[in-house]
From Swiss-Prot:
GO annotation terms (biological process): DNA-templated transcription termination; transcription antitermination
Span list, region Disordered: 139-165
Protein name: Transcription antitermination protein NusB
Gene3D superfamilies recorded: NusB-like
Gene for this chain: nusB
GO cellular component assignments: cytosol
Sequence similarity: Belongs to the NusB family.
NCBIfam families in the record: nusB
Organism (species): Laribacter hongkongensis (strain HLHK9)
Taxonomy, superkingdom: Bacteria
Length: 165
């Protein structure tokens, strides 16, 4: 089941996508998206923050993340670009939302709307950007993940008895 915040992010990505293709005003995009019956289930405040926040200065946001692209900016699909713009805005402007949540949501949205491997590109770009804009939180998350992994040199417990040599 999708949360209201996930729905808000999905609608924001759809709005940013529409803006890229049709150069519509944010108000027109919002009106069009509100016609979708699922919009009522979205977190409206988050949707508006993301849509209007990104479309207020998309050039600045894209220039901040473009250095982390492993391809030319014009080769980034409109869906991937929309997801990246939304998540980059959220990483810098929504400090109360954990970076792991922002990145995971972006990956899932890229899987839903993007191409077969688009989510990997989104993950890579956002990982690098998060390390830049939220270095302390990024290191804490990274350290936590490292500590959760079993060490390669430690034996892993199994239900099978050890084989006799």
């Amino acid at each position: 089941m999708k949360t209201p915040r996930r729905r808000a992010r999905e609608f924001a990505v759809q709005g940013i996508y529409q803006w890229q293709l049709n150069a519509l005003t944010p108000a027109t995009i919002e009106k069009n998206l509100r016609d979708n019956e699922q919009f009522a289930k979205a977190d409206e405040a988050l949707f508006r923050t993301l849509l209007y926040g990104v479309l207020n200065d998309p050039v600045r946001i894209e220039s901040a993340i473009a250095s982390h692209f492993e391809r030319a900016p014009e080769d980034v699909s409109p869906v991937e670009r929309a997801v990246l713009l939304m998540a980059a805005f959220e990483l810098t402007q929504q400090a109360e939302t954990p970076l792991a949540v922002i990145i995971n949501e972006a990956i899932e949205i890229a899987k839903t709307f993007g191409g077969a491997e688009g989510h990997r590109f989104v993950n890579g770009v956002l990982d690098k950007y998060a390390a830049e804009v939220r270095p302390e939180e990024f290191e804490a998350v990274r350290s936590h993940r490292r500590n959760k992994r079993p060490a390669a040199d430690k034996p892993v417990a199994t239900d099978k008895p050890a084989a006799a040599e």
